[in-house]
Amino acid sequence: MLKEFKEFIARGNVMDLAVGVIIGAAFTAIVKSLVSNLINPLIGIFLGKIDLSNLVFSIGSAHFRYGSFLNEVINFLIIAFVVFLMVKGINKVMPKKEEEAVKEGPSKEEEYLGQIVELLKKQDK
C-alpha cells in the first residue's frame, strides 16, 4: 500500500496540483494585502472612510457588516481576473493540438452510393 501511495504522489498530476494549491494560497495573501492596503484606501477616499471592513448598518440590534463583504467581493474579482489572464496567456503559449481525424467506417450514404454503383455496373454487363 505504501508503494501505491508513492506512485500516486509521484505522478505529475498530483505534484502539479500540490504546487498549484501552494501558489494559490500565497497568491490569495498577496491579493488580500493589495485590497486592504491599496484598493480599500483608494475607495475609502471617495467614501470618506479608509477602512471599508468597518462599514456597518444597523436595524435594531442586527448589524450588517457590508464592508467586510465588499472586501471579499473585491478579493474574488481580482483573483478571478488574474486567473482569467493567466489561462488566456497559457492558451496563447501552449501549442495547439491538432485534432486527430478519427477514421470511421463509411457513412450510410456512402454505403448506399457504393451499392448503387455496384448495381449499375451489374446492369451494364
Curated annotation (Swiss-Prot):
Function: Channel that opens in response to stretch forces in the membrane lipid bilayer. May participate in the regulation of osmotic pressure changes within the cell.
GO molecular function: mechanosensitive monoatomic ion channel activity
SUPFAM superfamilies in the record: Gated mechanosensitive channel
Protein name listed in UniProt: Large-conductance mechanosensitive channel
HAMAP family listed in its UniProt record: MscL
Localization (cell): Cell membrane
Keyword Transmembrane attributed: yes
Membrane-spanning residues: 19-39, 42-62, 67-87
Principal localisation: membrane
GO cellular component: plasma membrane
Membrane topology according to the record: Multi-pass membrane protein
Keywords attached to this entry: Cell membrane, Ion channel, Ion transport, Membrane, Transmembrane, Transmembrane helix, Transport
Gene: mscL
Quaternary structure (record): Homopentamer.
Family in the record: Belongs to the MscL family.
Signal peptide region: none
